[in-house]
Amino acid sequence: MKDGFIKAAAGTPDVRVADCEFNATEIIRMVHEMEEQGAKVMVFPELCITAYTCGDLFWQENLLEEAKVQLVRIAEETADVDALIFVGLPLEYKGKLYNVAAGLNHGEILGFVPKINLPNYNEFYEARYFTSGENLDGTVHIDRDVYRA
C-alpha cells in the first residue's frame, strides 16, 4: 500500500475451451506477473477456468469436477502471493449450476459470489445453463476438502 492506495489488476488469460488445466496454468502465470507489478487485488474474467464458450459442455460432470480441481490448484500454487484473487468457474450447488467468482487468498478459497443477472439474448444464453444467485439465502461456504474427493 502506498499513500493509502492498493494496486488492482485485471487479467485476461489466453484460454482454451474446456481445457481447465491449461487455463489454470495461464491464470497462475498471470498472478505471479501481477504480483511482480505490486498488485494486491487481481480479477480474472467470468468462467475463466473453463472458458466462457463451453455451451452444452457446462452440463458435463467431468468439466465441472475438473474446474474444481483446478480451482484448488490455483489456490495452492498462489498461496505465497499476498493478494486477493478472483477467478470464475461454473459451480454446482444443490442440483443447480451457478456462474461464480471464487475469492482466493494465501492458498485458501474464501467463498463464492454467484452471478445474479444472466443475459439471455442474441449470442448470450447464460440462462440456459446457469441459475441466478439472486435467491440464495445467506453465505454459501464450500470447504476445499470437498474438492479432494
Spans of model-derived segments:
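Enzyme catalytic cores with a strong preference for nitrogen-chemistry domains
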Residues: M1-A149
